[in-house]
Amino acid sequence: MRVAMISMHTSPLQQPGVGDSGGMNVYILSTGTELARQGVEVDIFTRATRPSQGEVVQVAPNLRVINIVAGPYEGLAKEELSTQLAAFAGGVLEFTRRGGIEYDLIHSHYWLSGQVGWLMRDLWRIPLVHTAHTLAAVKNSYRADEDTPESEARRICEQQLVDNADVLAVNTQEELADLVHHYDADPDRISVVSPGADIALYTPGNDRATERSRRELGVPLHAKVVAFVGRLQPFKGPQVLIHAVAELLERDPQRNLRVLICGGPSGPSATPETYRNLAVELGVDKRIRFLDPRPPEELVAVYRAADIIAVPSYNESFGLVAMEAQATGTPVVAARVGGLPVAVAEGETGLLVDGHDPALWADTLATLLDDDETRIRMGQDAVEHARNFSWAATATQLSSLYSEATTAECDGGIPRRADGARWD
């Protein structure tokens, strides 16, 4: 089987935590790699962002990333990339025609890619599987006060994809429910495919490994450490953690607490300086260390150095950071939103917080920070929990889904009107 994956707005080869690169990039590269190992030929189409990239990158046997020139290499924000959909689609068509390449199925990721996938589906007359990763209606329902709302244009495009894709692949039952509730999706066309973690890379370390990680990161060996890993934007909630830390230290100024915030800027709503300034304003800047985004092999040290990983997001379709942390043996305190209650086994591998009140977050963090026995037990259970979520298992689910889609009587290649209805 040969599959065309589309990830227009961000390359799976880009460093997670930088700009628009995050969990989706990890998902695409990880599933592509595992599908390739299972014998599926995968081409991932993405927009070129620098001339030195080269058109084709052979990532592994059966796995290529195709860089399509569409608009300037730099200077376009994600919100402006819809202006380049035609150029990108034209580049995909030109590449496949030049190489005489035919695909059995398209798998698009995010709404921008979905619009291109929808067109390719009708031109190539093959099935379209679409994964949204995030949804405008959901983000607007849960967004932080500081966040910029998602546009109505995006929501309309997502509705078109919900109505026209042959299969909608989602991470959890919660995401399925969101599609039905906000977009009136047909449940029979939705398949739940659980994401995973690189459980060969993210492994628990012993005391010596933890000590080494803390030395590398400049963290006191005997401090209690809470870490945040993710893009620095209000929707991910770093401001919630900073306020919670201020609350904890106001209650007990002598608490031996350190915080690591690992991530880069993303989106128009905030910059790293926003959060550094907030820490200074609240008087906790001496307790917080900001780290640049790190590749996965270096991110392991951040997870191992922490006693707790905090995931205060306003919504997550799954929560890869939570799963990676648990694979390394670090318990998680996460917001009770989206797919996080699936990623975190409440009371067993971590704790869930209702809402984003810093005082409540401080209470929950203190519960684990002050109970070594429970925290250590949760870390041990977290490793076992994470073993149920591997990228190999995700790829196996996707491969089965692809096979079903290519053999079923899907709408692949049947044009629809602009309102989503099929032509008679």
UniProtKB/Swiss-Prot annotation:
GO biological process: mycothiol biosynthetic process
SUPFAM superfamilies: UDP-Glycosyltransferase/glycogen phosphorylase
Name this protein carries in UniProt: D-inositol 3-phosphate glycosyltransferase
Catalytic activity: 1D-myo-inositol 3-phosphate + UDP-N-acetyl-alpha-D-glucosamine = 1D-myo-inositol 2-acetamido-2-deoxy-alpha-D-glucopyranoside 3-phosphate + UDP + H(+)
Chain sites annotated for binding Mg(2+): 303-304, 306, 330
Enzyme class at the top of the EC tree: transferase
UniProt-annotated binding residues for 1D-myo-inositol 3-phosphate: 9, 20-25, 78, 110, 134, 154
Binding site for UDP-N-acetyl-alpha-D-glucosamine: 15-16, 23, 231, 236, 294, 316, 324
Keywords annotated in UniProt: Glycosyltransferase, Magnesium, Metal-binding, Transferase
Family according to the record: Belongs to the glycosyltransferase group 1 family. MshA subfamily.
Single GO molecular function: magnesium ion binding
A Pfam family this chain is assigned to: Glycos_transf_1
UniProt organism field: Corynebacterium efficiens (strain DSM 44549 / YS-314 / AJ 12310 / JCM 11189 / NBRC 100395)
EC number assigned by the record: 2.4.1.250
Subunit structure: Homodimer.
InterPro entries per the UniProt record, alphabetical: Glyco_trans_1, Glyco_trans_4-like_N, Mycothiol_biosynthesis_MshA
Described purpose of this protein according to its UniProt entry: Catalyzes the transfer of a N-acetyl-glucosamine moiety to 1D-myo-inositol 3-phosphate to produce 1D-myo-inositol 2-acetamido-2-deoxy-glucopyranoside 3-phosphate in the mycothiol biosynthesis pathway.
HAMAP family xrefs: MshA
CDD domains from the UniProt entry: GT4_sucrose_synthase
UniProt keyword Magnesium present: yes
